[in-house]
């Protein structure tokens, strides 16, 4: 492990590889305890999370549901509950996966907010967008989608006196692969510190459908490239990112890409600058 790898892994509080199944189970329990303690300490009773159909939201959603079920059993307070939210932009091309995820998560309550009208309405009011190339405009509007989804989730949470869960984990955090004040905004991030294959391992252990566990990750924000794989955007694979974060050898090219991207996206992981 290079000094830079160690520095980045420490900054992201990366969880070491699971030594065995017992370590995996212990990590699941630790994260459920974190969710339960966060709720109890907040004095609130409701969790809210957008479900996309990917492995990250599937895993975080199931952990959230299990946590509120345990809280109800432990406290006798039936007000603890989890709201899973679908946030499509018009019709999602992999809606079947989102529905499979919802079925697996088995949330106490489900809600749907189609963000298309809000995204279009805002985009039409911002004249600066019309000056951009098609590709640049598509990228900017992709970030608008992520931020509108954040607004919707926090609106639901506010209406129910709840907290918003985020799905960020170490393999995305190191690449800054989230929208600032969009999907990066949340009250608690129960997958933090995990690398991608650890998220998959937790999902599999919890019983998630295999096609969701192994699904190709995509942010799916761009109209010109629907379903664009994360790894294509990264320029490296999740296997390489995971190996880097766990201090293992990666190619010189992968190492340089990860370090360069980490440095370039530092602003996403920090609080706003002040004088």
Curated annotation (Swiss-Prot):
The keyword ATP-binding applies. CDD domains: NAD_synthase. Mg(2+) binds at residues 56, 172. Its EC number is 6.3.1.5. InterPro entries: NAD/GMP_synthase (IPR022310), NAD_synthase (IPR003694), NH(3)-dep_NAD(+)_synth (IPR022926), Rossmann-like_a/b/a_fold (IPR014729). GO terms for molecular function: ATP binding; glutaminase activity; metal ion binding; NAD+ synthase (glutamine-hydrolyzing) activity; NAD+ synthase activity. It comes from the Bacteria. It catalyses: deamido-NAD(+) + NH4(+) + ATP = AMP + diphosphate + NAD(+) + H(+). Deamido-NAD(+) binds at residues 147, 180, 187, 267-268. NCBIfam families: nadE, PRK00768.1. Homodimer. Belongs to the NAD synthetase family. This is NH(3)-dependent NAD(+) synthetase. It comes from Ectopseudomonas mendocina (strain ymp). The lineage of its organism: Bacteria, Pseudomonadati, Pseudomonadota, Gammaproteobacteria, Pseudomonadales. The gene is nadE.
